[in-house]
Regions:
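Short, small-residue-biased leader/transition segments that mark boundaries at the very start
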Residues: 1-5
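A short helix->loop->beta-strand "cap" motif at the edges of active sites that frequently abuts
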Residues: 16, 37, 90-94, 122
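Short beta-strand->loop structural element characteristic of the AMP-binding/adenylate-forming
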Residues: 38-45
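Active-site phosphate-binding strand-loop segment of PLP-dependent enzymes
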Residues: 46-107
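PLP-dependent aminotransferase class I/II
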Residues: 124-205
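Conserved PLP-anchoring active-site segment centered on the Schiff-base-forming lysine
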Residues: 10-26
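Conserved PLP-binding catalytic core of the aspartate aminotransferase-like
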Residues: 208-212
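A generic "structured core" feature
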Residues: 28-31, 202
Length: 212
């Protein structure tokens, strides 16, 4: 994923101001700072990124995890997601980086569509990885670019070679296309939900339940 972040910086420009969630995944801030781009912190509230703070932050790019925020676990509701998209629409140079890591294993509540899936104006860069869903040894991350940024990527960064072998890419593609990945996610989600319920039940039955 670190390489994906660096490609995004090169694509969007080091003259842009990147905003990250506060609190948030500290590694992201360090990557931006190490690549000599201005990085500002946007506080979160009970629904995710605070819109008033975002508007006052003078950021060009917002990097967030709306479906499974780290470290709070907050899931941004659909109304706030549309507000965030509205912020991006107010300026041509604004974009949103939707980091959807670990969103597949949300165990409570109804599914909420990703920002990218409800974006009709090409303002969202979607990124994810298979490290959590399949195995830490599968070092494959990806990003989905809006049409206009895809064209810019081809013009500016098409000289980069993929660090993942063709064999791994084709194998993973076949695994997805044949429906095995979706079945795997569904089975794993059920397993994790059972494990969570057993853990909570054990805590409730513990003599220490009143203080945990």
């Amino acid at each position: 994923a670190s390489d994906v972040y660096k490609r995004q910086i090169q694509l969007l420009g080091r003259d842009k101001t990147f905003a990250v969630e506060d609190p948030g995944y500290e590694k992201i801030r360090k990557i931006y700072n190490s690549n000599n781009v201005k990085c500002v912190s946007i506080p979160i509230d009970e629904e995710g990124v605070n819109i008033d703070a975002l508007k006052a932050g003078n950021a060009d790019i917002l990097h967030l995890s709306p479906s499974h925020h780290y470290p709070t676990g907050i899931v941004t509701p659909i109304g706030r997601r549309y507000e965030i998209l509205g912020w991006a629409l107010n300026c041509e140079s604004r974009y949103i980086i939707e980091d959807d890591y670990d969103s597949e294993f949300r165990l409570l509540g109804k599914p909420i569509p990703s920002l990218e899936s409800i974006d009709v104006s090409g303002k969202v860069i979607y990124m994810n990885t298979f490290t959590k869903t399949l195995s830490p040894t599968i070092r494959i991350s990806y990003m989905v670019l809006p049409v206009q940024l895809m064209q810019l990527f081809k013009e500016k960064l098409n000289f980069y070679a993929c660090t993942v072998s063709n064999f791994e890419q084709y194998t993973l593609a076949a695994f997805i296309n044949k429906g095995y990945f979706e079945k795997h996610i569904n089975r794993t989600r059920i397993l994790y939900r059972r494990q969570r319920d057993m853990f909570i039940d054990a805590i409730n039955k513990s003599p220490l339940s009143s203080i945990i």
